[in-house]
Swiss-Prot record:
It catalyses: L-glutamyl-tRNA(Gln) + L-glutamine + ATP + H2O = L-glutaminyl-tRNA(Gln) + L-glutamate + ADP + phosphate + H(+); L-aspartyl-tRNA(Asn) + L-glutamine + ATP + H2O = L-asparaginyl-tRNA(Asn) + L-glutamate + ADP + phosphate + 2 H(+). Keywords: ATP-binding, Ligase, Nucleotide-binding, Protein biosynthesis. It is an enzyme of class 6 (ligase). Its EC number is 6.3.5.-. NCBIfam families: gatC. GO terms for biological process: glutaminyl-tRNAGln biosynthesis via transamidation; regulation of translational fidelity; translation. GO terms for molecular function: asparaginyl-tRNA synthase (glutamine-hydrolyzing) activity; ATP binding; glutaminyl-tRNA synthase (glutamine-hydrolyzing) activity. Transmembrane segments: none annotated. Heterotrimer of A, B and C subunits. The lineage of its organism: Bacteria, Bacillati, Bacillota, Bacilli, Lactobacillales. This is Glutamyl-tRNA(Gln) amidotransferase subunit C.
Amino acid sequence: MKISEEEVRHVAKLSKLSFSESETTTFATTLSKIVDMVELLNEVDTEGVAITTTMADKKNVMRQDVAEEGTDRALLFKNVPEKENHFIKVPAILDDGGDA
């Protein structure tokens, strides 16, 4: 299935993305190849193959909750650019980025 450059531009507009003409051409070609590969996979006969939801053979691997000694605070704070009251101070990411 061929993905047209117009379809790429349409989806880009919906996603509020902008691409150059060469990027649009590249995306159209790449997406067409991806869709072709998925269509090829859809042709594979999976009759009689058990449904697989995970490749891991273990579920809910648990360990004992044991307190362990952490990193030496003096060593940890040695490379910290800013600290306050024995805490590492970082820029706030909410409320306009002011101090937390």
